[in-house]
Amino acid sequence: MSSQLQQVIEAAWEDRANLSVASAPAAVREAVAHVLGELDAGRIRVAERQAVGQWQVNQWVKKAVLLSFRLNDNVVMGDGALTFFDKVPSKFGGMDEAALRATGVRVVPPAVARRGSFIARGAILMPSYVNIGAYVDEGTMVDTWATVGSCAQIGKNVHLSGGVGIGGVLEPLQAGPTIIEDNCFIGARSEVVEGVVVEENSVISMGVYIGQSTKIYDRATGEVTYGRIPSGSVVVSGNLPSADGKYSLYCAVIVKRVDAQTRAKTSINDLLRG
């Protein structure tokens, strides 16, 4: 089934300039809707983990998400005084208590998750936003005013602190999703974007900004890398001087590896889960 879906999506993607709400063939509509349903249920993912720091991106799934915006028109949605006009419905809209209990997810008002995102059992959504195509795994907390961007992949037992931004892939268009692996702690108001991978058990301090062009400086080795935080790193914001010493530019600094003291300060609180 997956290979047939992929073929339909790939063909539709090549013909996307000719697709519209009015003209799209039924087979394309059904394929895109099916992919979004599978994403919503967590049976299909935009990216799948192969090993620590190694992910396979399913580009055709991302293409299906993008095609959905071409195939669907804006509609009025909402409740009471809150009215919206959009192409993507709420993930939890229309669910009764039994259905919500069955998800195993705690959703604190006014948290929003769009349909086509997956939120695993034991996750907590404080007043936050989870975009289409995103995957939030078990035991993760998305704290107040945090944003999980389109198609971002968030691992198990992750804490995204208040105001954190995890970048999406839809605009500007990115090749791969931003990925936060298992047991990571992302400090308040930090931003991880542009397909950066934060490997498991890492701690990103408050107010750290990491994109593909951000220098990542390892204090222990003096090495500068881009686009990936190694497993078990503790990262803070910093600056590196220019070659002529006339100015400095922002960087992210790996100051040490996670130890017992770091873990004690950033461990998740089981009292808040369950």
Curated annotation (Swiss-Prot):
It catalyses: (S)-2,3,4,5-tetrahydrodipicolinate + succinyl-CoA + H2O = (S)-2-succinylamino-6-oxoheptanedioate + CoA. It is an enzyme of class 2 (transferase). Pathway: Amino-acid biosynthesis; L-lysine biosynthesis via DAP pathway; LL-2,6-diaminopimelate from (S)-tetrahydrodipicolinate (succinylase route): step 1/3. It is found in: Cytoplasm. The lineage of its organism: Bacteria, Pseudomonadati, Pseudomonadota, Betaproteobacteria, Burkholderiales. Keywords: Acyltransferase, Amino-acid biosynthesis, Cytoplasm, Diaminopimelate biosynthesis, Lysine biosynthesis, Repeat, Transferase. Its EC number is 2.3.1.117. PANTHER family: 2,3,4,5-TETRAHYDROPYRIDINE-2,6-DICARBOXYLATE N-SUCCINYLTRANSFERASE, MOLYBDENUM COFACTOR GUANYLYLTRANSFERASE. One of its GO terms (cellular component) is cytoplasm. Disulfide bonds: none annotated. The gene is dapD. This is 2,3,4,5-tetrahydropyridine-2,6-dicarboxylate N-succinyltransferase. Pfam families: Hexapep_2, THDPS_N_2. GO terms for molecular function: 2,3,4,5-tetrahydropyridine-2,6-dicarboxylate N-succinyltransferase activity; nucleotidyltransferase activity. It comes from Leptothrix cholodnii (strain ATCC 51168 / LMG 8142 / SP-6) (Leptothrix discophora (strain SP-6)). GO terms for biological process: diaminopimelate biosynthetic process; lysine biosynthetic process via diaminopimelate. Its main location: cytoplasm. Belongs to the transferase hexapeptide repeat family.
